[in-house]
Structures are given as C-alpha cells and as structure tokens.
Amino acid sequence: MYISKQPFRKSKQPFRKSKQTFHKSKQPFRKFKQPFRKSKQPFRRRSRIGPGDRIDYRNMSLINRFISEQGKILSRRINRLTLKQQRLITVAIKQARILSFLPFRNYENEKQFQAQAISIITGPRHRKNRHIPQLTQKFNSNRNLRNSNQNLRNNNRNLSSDC
C-alpha cells in the first residue's frame, strides 16, 4: 500500500487553546489516618482588664500591669488587649508620666538589666593596668631577658654547626 506524501497545509484558523480546564484530582494528595479535628469550643484568653476597671491615668494599680520593669509600655501581644484597650492604656500611661504619677523610665531596674545583658553577651571583663610604671619596667626587663636568652641560644647553635 502506497501512501502519497501531501504537502503540509497551513490551517486558516488560528491555534485555539482547548476550553477544557485543568481538573484537580478528587482525592487529596496525602491521606491521614486520623483527620485533624478542631475543638468544639473556641479558645479565648481572659483579658487582664476586668469589666469594672476604668482605664484612667489615676488608676495606678491597673496601669502598672502594663509597664515593663524598665518602665516601657508592653506590646499588645504581651498584654493580650484589644486595639482600643491598648490605645487607652497607652494614653493613660503617657498622661500619668506627664503629670509625674509615673517615671518616664525606671533607671534602677534599667541599669541592672543592662549590666546583666552585657555580662551575658561579653562575659566578665578584666582591666589591664597599662599605665603603672613599675609594671611596664618589669615587662620590659622580662622582654630583654627573653631576647638575650634567645640570642645566646642562636649563638650556641651557630658555633656547634661550624664545628
């Protein structure tokens, strides 16, 4: 059977993409033996502000809960407050600072905190006594002795190698 070769004909219609969309398989990629179950009850932490507490610059017992040891305002993440509550607390703290109910910074705790942080990072520091003349004289005399001993050793080697 002979099949004749026909020349390649260009179609008059432009190339069309198929209208079929890509279908994802019905089965999930990985099957787990026990599916993940959400708890029935929503997990909600209680706010540190009670229903009767007024957020005011005079309410120092409430304000002190939201200030760190260094005297900084704690973040919302740590406080677990709503945005509105956090704003009110921040305003109250700033008012209390301006009216000198609160210090702007707690310097005593801050110094302790900085000293601890530095010692943890760098380790203990030892001071070098460089400017005491007696020590520098001792150091120089020791250096001179070392140099003279080394020169003697070198001379002895040279003499022994010449023989």
Swiss-Prot record:
Gene Ontology terms for molecular function: small ribosomal subunit rRNA binding; structural constituent of ribosome
Location in or out of the cell: Plastid, Chloroplast
The protein's name: Small ribosomal subunit protein bS18c
Main location: plastid
NCBIfam families per record: S18
Annotated region (Disordered), positions in chain: 1-52, 144-163
Key words, A-Z: Chloroplast, Plastid, Ribonucleoprotein, Ribosomal protein, RNA-binding, rRNA-binding
HAMAP family: Ribosomal_bS18
Compositionally biased region (Basic residues): 7-48
GO cellular component, one term: chloroplast
Complexes and interactors: Part of the 30S ribosomal subunit.
Protein's GO biological process: translation
Family to which the UniProt record says this protein belongs: Belongs to the bacterial ribosomal protein bS18 family.
